[in-house]
Amino acid sequence: MLIIETLPLLRQQIRRWRQEGKRVALVPTMGNLHEGHMTLVEDAKTRADVVVVSIFVNPLQFERPDDLARYPRTLQEDCEKLTRHGVDLVFAPAAADVYPAGLEAQTYVDVPALSTILEGASRPGHFRGVSTIVSKLFNLVQPDVACFGEKDYQQLALIRKMVADMGYDINIVGVPIVRAKDGLALSSRNGYLSAQERKIAPQLYKIMQALAEKLALGERQIDDLLADTAEQLRDAGFTPDELFIRDAQSLQPLTVDSKQAIILMAAWLGKARLIDNQQVDLHS
């Protein structure tokens, strides 16, 4: 497995693969890899001849410097896992190489229709940071296919719109959420949980399932459903952060024509901000 840290060497290797006619898959990550990431890798391997995994803790995605500083950086362990899973290349650049002019002078890619709603309303600039780094990685790696987890549902929708709007010839694949046996969605941030908090954490999924069942049975008093769900989260020990029920395709409020809903949840448990989502088929 190749480990490349500079842009010129990455371009050189990508050019070589292109000359050989190889199909390239990209799995963008911020490192601290877990089995959910490995599922993305395994999916990517079925879709391409070579798989590139990027590991870059993107400063543009963090509102608070302390959150950026404490984000786990485990490059050696990550590379060992990726070697075992047959990855061809790890791209692990420094921030100074990705943003040589500094963050203030950086050119941004924005998807305004999706970057300022829902989670984006409370995290200004976050999704602009996502679309900027993903666009840059697309330009550098020039993948035929890129795999993203469905756990970050709004992010996936934003990337799909960016690809469509910008004319990228890239197949965007959403890979289903990977869960622990007790239902907790796998996340790098689960490492922030204490032992006691880890026992509580699966309640997020169970509470979301109960909400999904009510929607599937035809309940449509959205404000009441959300208020009840928030109360259940608080009773379980969470601090609710974001809670939405939206049209799964447009991310806009449900209408009589909506065929599928998406429940988007984010809640704090101790120092960990846990997110999850679930799609629900709506029957008229």
UniProtKB/Swiss-Prot annotation:
Catalysis: reaction(s): (R)-pantoate + beta-alanine + ATP = (R)-pantothenate + AMP + diphosphate + H(+)
Gene: panC
GO cellular component, one term: cytosol
One of the GO biological process terms: pantothenate biosynthetic process
Other facts noted in the record for this chain: The reaction proceeds by a bi uni uni bi ping pong mechanism.
Keyword field: ATP-binding, Cytoplasm, Ligase, Nucleotide-binding, Pantothenate biosynthesis
Self-association state and partner proteins as the record states: Homodimer.
Residues that coordinate or bind beta-alanine: 61
Broad enzyme group: ligase
Organism: Yersinia enterocolitica serotype O:8 / biotype 1B (strain NCTC 13174 / 8081)
Domain of life, source organism: Bacteria
Name of protein: Pantothenate synthetase
Record-linked Pfam families: Pantoate_ligase
